[in-house]
Structures are given as structure tokens and as C-alpha cells.
Amino acid sequence: MSDTINSMELRFADNLLPSQLMEGDLIKVDNEYVTIETLTQNEDGFNIYTRNDFDEEGHIYLFDDETIEWYVFFEE
């Protein structure tokens, strides 16, 4: 891991609606931090495809009005 990442801390930033998310964002799903790979929208919600630190793929579905925890790296 690079020295830059080692000096940064992962912090909770906000609860976001799926329409506020974008590819590359870090979210928390089932007590695991994952990166959003792809988002697709249909008539009532969003398919969100993710990848974890072990390179395992995942999928969640969120309705338009659901929120999810969004995390960012914060430099100390």
C-alpha cells in the first residue's frame, strides 16, 4: 500500500441516495467497505455492482428513496 493511503483514514461522510452515487465511490454493504464498479437505473431503483478488497464482485439493489453509507479517505 502506498504511503499516501497509509497516512489517510477512512471516514463516514454521509448517507446518500442512489442517484447521488457514482462509480468509484466507497460504500458500506453488510459491514464491508466496497467500491462501486457500475450503476444502472431502472424505473424504480438502481442496480449497484461492487468490488471488495479481495477483488470479489457483489450486487445490491436500492430503491430511489433508500440511502446507503458513503465513505471517503481523509488525510490526517
Question: Which residue stretches match the model-derived regions?
Answer:
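Extended hydrophobic/Leu-rich segments
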Residues: I5, L10, V34-I36, I48-Y49, ...
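Short, charged beta-turn/beta-strand-edge "cap" motif at the junction between a beta-strand
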Residues: L16, E32-T35
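Short, hydrophobic/aromatic-rich segments at coil-to-beta transitions
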Residues: M22-G24, F46
